Design a protein with these regions (language model features):
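Short, charged, surface-exposed hinge/linker loops at domain edges
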Residues: 1-6, 40-75
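A detector of short terminal or domain-flanking linear segments
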Residues: 1-5, 17, 29
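Short aromatic-glycine-(Arg/Gly/Cys) micro-motifs in beta-strand/loop hairpins
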Residues: 10-22
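A short, exposed loop/beta-hairpin motif centered on an aromatic-Gly-Thr core
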Residues: 26-35
Length: 75
């Protein structure tokens, strides 16, 4: 058995549902009413992604950055 570590993005939508994704795999998303529930679901999705894809052909995760965007406000 081998253990891997993958980056995970956690978001909270307008309905209070946690959406989690692993940017290393395309389409690797899950959701839940708690973060733990969402992460448990994502773990299963990641396992399926590993079974279907070679780990050599996955996206290389670089990082997450915050970006400032200024928009004009009309009077």
């Amino acid at each position: 058995m081998k253990t891997y570590h993958f980056p995970v993005v956690v978001e909270l939508d307008e309905d209070g549902v946690y959406i989690v994704s692993c940017p290393v795999f395309k389409g690797c998303h899950a959701f839940g009413s708690t973060i733990d529930e969402a992460l448990d679901s994502l773990r299963e999705v990641i396992e399926m992604c590993i079974e279907e894809q070679s780990l050599e052909n996955v996206n290389q995760f670089i990082g997450v950055r915050e970006m400032e965007v200024t928009i004009p406000i009309s009077a």
